[in-house]
Amino acid sequence: MSKSENLYAQAQQLIPGGVNSPVRAFTGVGGIPLFIERADGAYLFDVDGKAYIDYVGSWGPMILGHNHPAIRQAVIEAVERGLSFGAPTEMEVKMAQLVTDLVPTMDMVRMVNSGTEATMSAIRLARGYTGRDKIIKFEGCYHGHADCLLVKAGSGALTLGQPNSPGVPADFAKHTLTCTYNDLASVRQAFEQYPQEVACIIVEPVAGNMNCIPPLPEFLPGLRALCDEFGALLIIDEVMTGFRVALAGAQDYYHVIPDLTCLGKIIGGGMPVGAFGGRREVMNALAPTGPVYQAGTLSGNPIAMAAGFACLTEISQVGVYETLTELTDSLATGLRHAAKEENIPLVVNHVGGMFGLFFTNADTVTCYQDVMNCDVERFKRFFHLMLEEGVYLAPSAFEAGFMSLAHSNEDIQKTVNAARRCFAKL
């Protein structure tokens, strides 16, 4: 028995499913999850001593690669000053200034501890500001595990085959209207059915929790226009895309202005952090200046702020996103060519530093139903073949992959060569 197998057996007796987040259990691909001992650069090293080229990147935060020296040093220095104070710090102010400088649509920002906290709080703020109850989200888009958002959700909810999680009261779910991603007609229909009741739309600008689905050109501007027409707020959930698709996020890449933005992952540099922010008028409705309540014991804690500040400082350098995009383009092109050589039907979507693989005969994958029509069984086989080759992809057909600045051209070529061998076995 390998060390991973032994640890998993122990973990299953102590932790539900043996993991602290469902997708890690390999439910979507079968088999025993890897237990990781350490990571460095573009590589993971499991407890059995095997190295893997990593395209999960802790589910997105590791844009600089693992164990980056600038982040490591920032954390060490912060730890030496104390772990948490429960009081304001200078680093919170510096971090807020940096975030609002980098994302021009955010006049103000509030730090929280996770992406779920960010989206949950932004929705509460939108409801409080507008005085309305209903929200619009999209099939296959995942915005964390708040009750009102686990309705036709993506990510682990898709992997587990539970679009509506047990434990979510019908009274909560009834205020969530679900539309089709990339389909403006479905959104207009929802607004026209409830013209005075919708507080906000919340949307992933690139849907990264049903793999990787970029928006059609008219989609995000169309959502902005519909929100303006019906008096709702537009919340762009950039927990995944923020600082990954572009320095100012997917909203800058696709030229759309939200009322509120949710952030996470990269802004913590590997530490647990979330944030939400936007127009000053809306943010001033938040306690203590306004009536909408939100709080957190560890929000803005000094360790996370130090790691996040170091990460954002590094990725603000000239040329970072050109390099990241070139690496992702190279991988996507190589995978397409390798699949074609082996007569494997494959669609590869990619934007900035994120990508998705779809085993499908379709020419494009643009919505939830397209994803549901893909060959999940073939992905499972491909995943395990790639794992044997030393390449670690997301262990679910419904999760995006992530490039880092630590990946080299040699890593990309190794990955493409491995994929070619795996395609030949499919």
Curated annotation (Swiss-Prot):
Listed Pfam families: Aminotran_3
UniProt pathway: Porphyrin-containing compound metabolism; protoporphyrin-IX biosynthesis; 5-aminolevulinate from L-glutamyl-tRNA(Glu): step 2/2
PTM-bearing positions, type N6-(pyridoxal phosphate)lysine: K265
Enzyme class: isomerase
Keywords tagged on the record: Cytoplasm, Isomerase, Porphyrin biosynthesis, Pyridoxal phosphate
Gene Ontology annotations of biological process type: protoporphyrinogen IX biosynthetic process
Swiss-Prot/TrEMBL cofactor(s): pyridoxal 5'-phosphate
Reaction equation(s) it catalyzes: (S)-4-amino-5-oxopentanoate = 5-aminolevulinate
First and last residue of the signal peptide: none
Chief subcellular location: cytoplasm
Subcellular location per the Swiss-Prot or TrEMBL entry: Cytoplasm
Record flagged with keyword Isomerase: yes
InterPro entries: 4pyrrol_synth_GluAld_NH2Trfase (IPR004639), Aminotrans_3 (IPR005814), Aminotrans_3_PPA_site (IPR049704), PyrdxlP-dep_Trfase (IPR015424), PyrdxlP-dep_Trfase_major (IPR015421), PyrdxlP-dep_Trfase_small (IPR015422)
CC annotations in GO: cytoplasm
GO molecular function, one term: pyridoxal phosphate binding
Subunit composition and interactions: Homodimer.
Similarity section: Belongs to the class-III pyridoxal-phosphate-dependent aminotransferase family. HemL subfamily.
Protein name, UniProt field: Glutamate-1-semialdehyde 2,1-aminomutase
Species of provenance: Yersinia pseudotuberculosis serotype O:1b (strain IP 31758)
Organism taxonomic ancestry: Bacteria, Pseudomonadati, Pseudomonadota, Gammaproteobacteria, Enterobacterales
